[in-house]
């Protein structure tokens, strides 16, 4: 059966109109023009299943659409067994792309609903499936503006995007509906960088600033912790010497992380925060920038064992 998948990229604005769309990966395009999908949305199938309100909102948004064919599915009985599951797999793939957009810059782009239309010869004779996610990503500052991406910024995200393998989606996780916890388990080969990404995503989906900071701190611990003593001091020191280029920048980074951990300590122990809202915003934004730089660079030291990491940072400290 042939298919078309559509999902809105909420809060995303492109600097130019892209009617046909720009290819993200084979079969998938990002667009902000209605011409690409008008043949889909202006049909009775869409009106009766998706509804006119949702249809019109997609036309006026930035969205992703994916065209292809399920070579292993030939009739509605087969499609009904896996339709929702495959809708989730497409939706998770686009959510994965939003993480690449974050690597370009801080933003509040997210996906919620995805629609899959499956058909044989004629679209009107097809069937509709829907999947929904709950992660609403926000700016590190929690500002409420749209995120505008230039052509060069979009190109950077697309060039660096590596689609998830089909092996990531199976019956056990229902096409990605149920997140996999293996990345957190040591006996499943958990890796520092993947855990850091996990908590960074948690920070981006937090709507309360102190919770963002807690998750950002967890992400830093995933990358830098090698023991249980003086954790926050070691992390502040290691962030400073790894990213700082001058005495002043190293000092500022050290103070940023120390301040973040003061907020984190009060938050996780249920205390009232002794902070002004503007201070929380500055720290949250600073941590977001730090993690973006660390994750994008993906230094080889983060794949080393604890002793090798300790030796690396000791050498860096006294170099």
Positions of predicted regions on the chain:
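Charged, non-catalytic interaction/linker regions at domain boundaries
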Residues: 1-211, 280-282, 288-289, 294-318
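Short runs of predominantly hydrophobic/aromatic residues within well-ordered alpha helices
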Residues: 193-196, 212-216, 220, 232, ...
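Short alpha-helical scaffolding segments that buttress acidic/His motifs in well-ordered protein cores
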Residues: 196, 200, 217-220, 239, ...
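Glycine- and acidic
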Residues: 198-204, 244-247, 272-277
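Flexible secondary-structure boundary motifs
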Residues: 214-251
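Composition- and surface-driven signal marking solvent-exposed, interaction-prone regions
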Residues: 216, 232-237, 273, 277-284
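Charged/polar positions within long, soluble alpha-helices
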Residues: 228, 265-273, 295-303
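Histidine-centered, metal-coordinating catalytic motifs and their short helical/loop contexts
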Residues: 251-279
